């Protein structure tokens, strides 16, 4: 009897911790607008248009206006004013670029994948 109870509890615990994750490689978490080349660092910056709390959770820092320097933004998306959908991760120290500290300073993000939003 104790063995059956133990097995039943174990099964319940195992299944209660299972949840479905979205592992579809064609989905994007976030949306942003490309702002243009940042004059301080020479790298394009983007402004997230939604999900700022998710950006903060991924990156670990946030800005009031949602602007970040976007390392690894694909060349075909480096056009001011276009809307994009993208996945990001926190940038590693070794991936940071040099900035002049003469202009506005924004946190960096690393773009994993991105594509243009077609209206």
Residue spans for each PLM region:
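Positively charged n-region of N-terminal signal peptides that target proteins for export
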Residues: 1-5
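Beta-strand/loop nucleic-acid-binding surfaces
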Residues: 58-76
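OB-fold/S1-family single-stranded nucleic acid-binding modules
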Residues: 91-119
């Amino acid at each position: 009897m104790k063995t059956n109870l133990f097995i039943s509890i174990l099964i319940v615990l195992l299944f209660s911790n299972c949840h479905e994750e979205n592992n579809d490689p064609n989905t994007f978490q976030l949306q942003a607008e490309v702002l243009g080349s940042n004059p301080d660092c020479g790298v394009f910056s983007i402004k997230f248009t939604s999900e700022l709390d998710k950006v903060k959770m991924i990156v670990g820092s946030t800005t009031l206006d949602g602007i970040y320097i976007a390392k690894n933004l694909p060349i075909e998306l480096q056009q001011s004013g276009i809307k994009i959908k993208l996945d990001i991760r926190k940038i590693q120290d070794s991936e940071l670029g040099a900035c002049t500290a003469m202009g506005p300073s924004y946190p960096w993000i690393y773009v994993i994948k991105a594509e243009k939003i077609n209206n």
